[in-house]
Amino acid sequence: MAAGFKTVEPLEYYRRFLKENCRPDGRELGEFRATTVNIGSISTADGSALVKLGNTTVICGVKAEFAAPPVDAPDRGYVVPNVDLPPLCSSRFRTGPPGEEAQVTSQFIADVVDNSQVIKKEDLCISPGKLAWVLYCDLICLDYDGNILDACTFALLAALKNVQLPEVTINEETALAEVNLKKKSYLNVRTNPVATSFAVFDDTLLIVDPTGEEEHLSTGTLTVVTDEDGKLCCLHKPGGSGLTGAKLQDCMSRAVTRHKEVSKLLDEVIQSMRHK
């Protein structure tokens, strides 16, 4: 009977749970799904991470290559994120060129990289005007069940913290790059951006970490990205219900709390990996 009601009136079905301050999956309104992270998942990448947020699963691989620095910024390198949402992860996606959600997510990740200064582009310059690193950050969703922005942001941060680059010098006589693979160092990850997403129901009720179904039924979504100092790096609000200043402040404070939880989880995994 309940399954039939959910099929015929999915929104009303959800409302009955929300009135009791809970959700159909058993979580409270402010409760996140179980979150796990593994780093170094792809042996052929320069850095990688696999993040699971409930059923939503994202893997990020970072590949470093050489390139000439931009003409207008000769002392900088590049960070190039790309998000792939293949049909493999959900029946809602089709084969072919990237769909709108994949493009929006890629742009969101690019904005997070730029606004948070997680990697300073100057740190990627090897020789000004001559040579710089390009970090290709490929994020692939393996299983889609909502809140892709949080999962991608976490996977990117974890993968960047796993990247080790070899020492590179320019031979003055030949003007060629010489790579010392025996001498590698970790990237200088300067900040720790963490995304926290919310769904709005009936224009007033906020829930955190929405599933795919909750996103579909909601009247709007909001993603807040904060750094380790509690500073706002990004705010992503793709239309939908408006929010009062008090609601936004509530989202900010919840995002700061979530940042501490995610940072603690990532630090524990990194420490265990580096002590192996």
Curated annotation (Swiss-Prot):
The keyword Nucleotide-binding does not apply. This is Exosome complex component RRP43. The keyword Transport does not apply. Non-catalytic component of the RNA exosome complex which has 3'->5' exoribonuclease activity and participates in a multitude of cellular RNA processing and degradation events. In the nucleus, the RNA exosome complex is involved in proper maturation of stable RNA species such as rRNA, snRNA and snoRNA, in the elimination of RNA processing by-products and non-coding 'pervasive' transcripts, such as antisense RNA species and promoter-upstream transcripts (PROMPTs), and of mRNAs with processing defects, thereby limiting or excluding their export to the cytoplasm. The modification N-acetylalanine is found at residue 2. InterPro entries: ExoRNase_PH_dom1 (IPR001247), ExoRNase_PH_dom2 (IPR015847), ExoRNase_PH_dom2_sf (IPR036345), Exosome_comp_Rrp42_subfam (IPR050590), PNPase/RNase_PH_dom_sf (IPR027408), Ribosomal_Su5_D2-typ_SF (IPR020568), Rrp43 (IPR033196). Belongs to the RNase PH family. GO terms for biological process: RNA catabolic process; RNA processing; rRNA processing. It is found in: Cytoplasm; Nucleus, Nucleolus; Nucleus. GO terms for molecular function: identical protein binding; mRNA 3'-UTR AU-rich region binding. GO terms for cellular component: chromosome; cytoplasmic exosome (RNase complex); cytosol; exosome (RNase complex); fibrillar center; nuclear exosome (RNase complex); nucleolar exosome (RNase complex); nucleolus. Component of the RNA exosome core complex (Exo-9), composed of EXOSC1, EXOSC2, EXOSC3, EXOSC4, EXOSC5, EXOSC6, EXOSC7, EXOSC8 and EXOSC9; within the complex interacts with EXOSC5 and EXOSC6. The catalytically inactive RNA exosome core complex (Exo-9) associates with the catalytic subunit EXOSC10/RRP6. Exo-9 may associate with DIS3 to form the nucleolar exosome complex, or DIS3L to form the cytoplasmic exosome complex. Exo-9 is formed by a hexameric base ring consisting of the heterodimers EXOSC4-EXOSC9, EXOSC5-EXOSC8 and EXOSC6-EXOSC7, and a cap ring consisting of EXOSC1, EXOSC2 and EXOSC3. Disulfide bonds: none annotated. It comes from Mus musculus. Keywords: Acetylation, Cytoplasm, Exosome, Nucleus, RNA-binding, rRNA processing.
